[in-house]
């Protein structure tokens, strides 16, 4: 269930209204998976979580070195935005909205902040509420983003409902 759940949520969310072409669903799903993969590569680095293995395989920085791991993560992040910009099926307004949703989920209000708080909390006694906040930022924001990306061209009164749904799925994902 953990693999490609974000991509599946984009398709499921988009299929509620059928405004997005399949090619754009693939573009958006790919962009989210690129961001997710970049975050895992960076998360494993010695300066972060210092993990030598990811899903039973040697981490990127163990196989290729720290410098190349950082560059690989950076390249994946840039590619995520590039493929959205290159999608000719999306309007310019939708492209901007998609890039804003994605950058908010992975930037200073999302994964980056969550990673920062996680690093700062190491070797400290933190509350369950603080742990949940960190996880909601590190993982939940990108899941919420996936649901919202599926609704990219469906600006409606249901936006709050889909955002709440995405947030709740993100919280549930932490339990699994």
Spell out what each predicted region is:
Residues 1-176:
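Mg2+-dependent prenyl diphosphate-binding active-site environment of isoprenoid biosynthetic enzymes
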